């Protein structure tokens, strides 16, 4: 991604907290968090290290998710890193490693605060306040007697240690507690980190009351202070959805998996943002686009369509929070029968989550605005699906063509295709060959992809003329335009458009054009490197001879099938070299 493109993309972002992801071929390469997304992403135009410079150079897109606070951004960032394992994420942002809690994978697990968890451990976090976390872990050890010693110490104990004497451990190492009881204690501690605050708060409250009754007021005060930390542990911005939220009835306490849905409508396209909370933490989000219906209650109709289409073949969450009431009673009844609590929050924490989902939905409509602007500028009723084409080669060698696809302004990499073309140094002929291939496959029903609304060619009038000849000769009814690199002029059959540099429709075409170019160059380089490797491994065949062979025969495959006499006709190739080439290839 070029500096100019990065700055332009950053300028489109809101100055709000959130998480950003640098993507390469739709693969997450880097995840970061920011208090202000716009400034943070803009800073990558001037990278601070070679590692980050390489990451930015390879990235072809940026995705974001908005959050309410930097803490929520941290938690979402950590979960996305955990899920995607991005190549360029060495540690969490700002060179800080945030603490986690792990229960080790041992027959008698230990609990500990760590910044470097075991790969097979049960892990919770990260958490932003280590003191609060250590207070919670110490309280859990006191209440449930969980060990905190290393496996080496555990395996070499023959009598209880000091931690048993002070009430921090139940001494499973010497059999002071049986395995079943210890496992039950571990399960209770795990439930606390899953969001069940009462697992720890209730026994502490009882202990505090007992101390007060016994007039041990100093001890009662200490327990009270710890209890305050425990009761706020899942509520002070650490949790997105609390399973102990007092604003709802007792039935919500069993809601571990919760989806939050927000709808934004822009013209004829609707965006549904889905936030997913698991055990009280915001762990994932996604965006989905649908055709917006006409008439009243459009958002309600969109939600109804989304609920049936999205959840028909997926696991249902325990609850779904919606920005609008779905207008179809059958959908609500279906979800109710499946045990899903669907509701529209009025106030409180859940209402804030709805606001957050709506922010993400509105942000997701930026690409829709670009598509609408492009359709407007070209006189189309709608442009949802665009395919881009480009040709790449080195002086007529290793000629390849790319075919990329964008749907609703975003790259759809599963619809990308590429093709090896005839090795000749003629850009127009090769573009015609590439488009003929695509058009014939479409007309013959051999391409499972839908026809695009628009084709974008990387080039000028010559490339566009060649592409249109291929499309029209084949009888494929698809509109075709070109985007020239030098002046960023949009060439159409009816004329040339010189749009402003900040025009949203131009940004969309540039992304399609640049992605087609990148995909073609990538494929060409892989083919070229293969050719170079095969011929360069033949003794006695230098660079000039390699070029002469490829000029004469067109490809390594043709060199391989050539007779020895034909090989000897090439300047620089004698009988011995011809024998070597034939034997090696």
Swiss-Prot record:
Keywords: Cytoplasm, DNA damage, DNA excision, DNA repair, Excision nuclease, SOS response. GO terms for biological process: nucleotide-excision repair; SOS response. This is UvrABC system protein C. The gene is uvrC. Gene3D superfamilies: 5' to 3' exonuclease, C-terminal subdomain (1.10.150.20), GIY-YIG endonuclease (3.40.1440.10), UVR domain (4.10.860.10), UvrC, RNAse H endonuclease domain (3.30.420.340). PROSITE patterns: GIY_YIG, UVR, UVRC. Belongs to the UvrC family. GO terms for cellular component: cytoplasm; excinuclease repair complex. Residues 15-90 form the GIY-YIG domain. InterPro entries: GIY-YIG_endonuc, GIY-YIG_endonuc_sf, GIY-YIG_UvrC_Cho, Hlx-hairpin-Hlx_DNA-bd_motif, RuvA_2-like, UVR_dom, UVR_dom_sf, UvrABC_protein_C. GO terms for molecular function: DNA binding; excinuclease ABC activity. Residues 198-233 form the UVR domain.
């Amino acid at each position: 991604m070029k500096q100019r493109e990065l700055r332009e993309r950053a300028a489109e972002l809101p100055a709000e907290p959130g998480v950003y992801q640098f993507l390469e071929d739709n693969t997450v390469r880097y995840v970061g968090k920011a208090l202000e997304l716009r400034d943070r992403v803009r800073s990558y135009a001037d990278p601070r290290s070679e590692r980050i410079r390489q990451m930015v150079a390879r990235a072809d897109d940026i995705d974001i998710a908005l959050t309410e606070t930097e803490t929520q951004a941290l938690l979402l960032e950590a979960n996305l890193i955990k899920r995607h394992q991005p190549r360029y994420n060495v540690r969490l942002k700002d060179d800080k490693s945030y603490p986690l809690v792990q229960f080790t994978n041992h027959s008698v697990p230990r609990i500990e605060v760590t910044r470097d968890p075991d790969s097979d451990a049960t892990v919770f976090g990260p958490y932003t306040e280590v003191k609060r976390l250590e207070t919670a872990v110490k309280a859990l050890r006191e209440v449930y007697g969980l060990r905190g010693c290393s496996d080496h110490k555990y395996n070499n104990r023959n009598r209880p240690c000091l931690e048993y004497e002070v009430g921090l451990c139940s001494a499973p190492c010497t059999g002071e507690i049986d395995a079943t009881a210890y496992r039950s204690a571990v399960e209770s501690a795990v439930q606390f980190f899953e969001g069940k605050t009462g697992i720890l708060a209730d026994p502490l409250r009882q202990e505090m009351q007992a101390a007060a009754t016994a007039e041990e007021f100093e001890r009662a005060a200490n327990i009270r202070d710890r209890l305050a930390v425990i009761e706020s542990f899942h509520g002070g911005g650490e949790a997105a959805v609390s399973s102990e939220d007092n604003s709802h009835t007792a039935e919500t306490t069993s809601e571990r998996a919760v989806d939050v849905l927000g709808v934004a409508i822009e013209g004829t396209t609707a965006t549904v943002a889905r936030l997913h909370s698991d055990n009280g933490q915001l762990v994932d989000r996604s965006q989905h686009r649908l055709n917006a219906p006409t008439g009243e209650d459009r958002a309600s109709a969109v939600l109804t369509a989304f609920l049936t289409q999205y959840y028909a073949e997926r696991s249902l969450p325990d609850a779904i929070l919606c920005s609008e009431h779905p207008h179809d009673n059958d959908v609500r009844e279906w979800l109710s029968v499946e045990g899903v609590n669907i509701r529209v929050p009025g106030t409180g924490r859940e209402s804030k989550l709805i606001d957050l989902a709506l922010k993400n939905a509105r942000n997701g409509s930026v690409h829709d605005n670009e598509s609408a602007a492009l359709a407007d500028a070209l006189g189309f009723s709608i442009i949802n699906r665009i395919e881009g084409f480009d040709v790449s080669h080195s002086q007529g060698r290793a000629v390849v063509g790319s075919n990329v696809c964008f749907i609703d302004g975003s790259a759809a990499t599963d619809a990308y295709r590429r093709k090896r073309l005839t090795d000749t140094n003629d850009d127009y002929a090769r573009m015609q060959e590439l488009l003929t291939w695509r058009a014939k496959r479409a007309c013959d029903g051999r391409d499972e992809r839908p026809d695009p609304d628009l084709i974008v060619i990387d080039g000028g009038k010559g490339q566009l003329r060649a592409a249109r000849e291929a499309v029209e000769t084949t009888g494929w009814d698809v509109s075709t335009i070109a985007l020239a690199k030098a002046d960023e002029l949009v060439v159409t059959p009816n004329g040339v458009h010189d749009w402003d540099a900040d025009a949203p429709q131009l940004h969309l075409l540039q992304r399609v054009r640049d992605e087609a170019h990148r995909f073609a160059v990538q494929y060409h380089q892989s083919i070229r490197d293969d050719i170079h490797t095969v011929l360069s491994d033949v003794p006695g065949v230098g660079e000039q001879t390699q070029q002469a062979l490829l000029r004469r025969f067109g490809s390594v495959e043709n060199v391989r099938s050539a007779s020895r006499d034909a090989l000897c006709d090439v300047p620089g190739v004698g009988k011995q070299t011809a024998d070597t080439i034939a034997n090696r290839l």
